[in-house]
Amino acid sequence: MKAKTLSRHLREGVKNLSRNGWMTFASVSAVTVTLLLVGVFLTAIMNMNHFATKVEQDVEIRVHIDPAAKEADQKKLEDDMSKIAKVESIKYSSKEEELKRLIKSLGDSGKTFELFEQDNPLKNVFVVKAKEPTDTATIAKKIEKMQFVSNVQYGKGQVERLFDTVKTGRNIGIVLIAGLLFTAMFLISNTIKITIYARSTEIEIMKLVGATNWFIRWPFLLEGLFLGVLGSIIPIGLILVTYNSLQGMFNEKLGGTIFELLPYSPFVFQLAGLLVLIGALIGMWGSVMSIRRFLKV
């Protein structure tokens, strides 16, 4: 496209915005509210994924070995478990190591258990991790049936509920965001339709004298682009300011736990870029949907 032609399309796009001032304001306001909600939902979903990933990384199967099992029996059990599909790693932990872990995890209260160092009631353990955390329950059920297994612990019931909750939350978030984006496209499309109705005779004349569809389409595409980008400015500003404060408060109270928010950078800048891109795309798509029927003379 020639620079002169592009300049003409840009001028027309800006002129279209000023011709319908109130509708432009209404559309930008609607896109602003929509993208703000999209930004909030994306922030919530991405941080929820962050929490879920941290939890998933901590999900493990603790296989307590039958005290009657000899060293050769333990080796066979380890070999059998390693043959299970989707097992990522198997780590042996002696009962002495298990007691130390218990004492450490309980802090000051754990000192009471130091009395058991001479007569340790705990069992030797294999710590098994799945390649995909969602396969933990399936792997645990297979291990339970093996010889020389005293019992298996992996948070039965809680793990399944956790994964179901995370999956449901993600799906709900996706549906809500899709609905909001559709609403924004509908509003932009209606705004541009008003401009096109006002210029329908001009468009027909341009078609009759040989103007290509794209020559006619470009100013409206740019108008939609401008509407979408303008609508993203306020949501980005609000997210940049509020996320910093929210992260400080959140991490001050829950720092060091799995419930730490994503780092301010690069998260907010990635989100800002995504909102600009979403705004531009829904604006241009709204334009495409509104103008196509007018390109037939």
Swiss-Prot record:
Residues 1-24, 193-219, 292-297 are cytoplasmic. The keyword Transmembrane applies. GO terms for biological process: cell division; chemokine-mediated signaling pathway; positive regulation of sporulation resulting in formation of a cellular spore. Residues 46-171, 241-270 are extracellular. InterPro entries: ABC3_permease_C, FtsX, FtsX_ECD. Disruption phenotype: Vegetative bacilli mutant cells exhibit a distinct morphology in which individual bacilli appear kinked with frequent curves and sharp angles among chains of bacilli. Grows more slowly than wild-type bacteria. Affords resistance of vegetative B.anthracis bacilli to human chemokine CXCL10 regardless of their growth phase and to murine Cxcl9-mediated bactericidal activity. CXCL10 treated spores fail to germinate and resume vegetative growth indicating that FtsX is not required for the ability of CXCL10 to target the spore form of B.anthracis. It is found in: Cell membrane. The keyword Cell membrane applies. Keywords: Cell cycle, Cell division, Cell membrane, Membrane, Pharmaceutical, Transmembrane, Transmembrane helix. One of its GO terms (cellular component) is plasma membrane. Belongs to the ABC-4 integral membrane protein family. FtsX subfamily. PANTHER family: CELL DIVISION PROTEIN FTSX (PTHR47755:SF1). Part of the ABC transporter FtsEX involved in asymmetric cellular division facilitating the initiation of sporulation. Interacts with FtsE. This is Cell division protein FtsX.
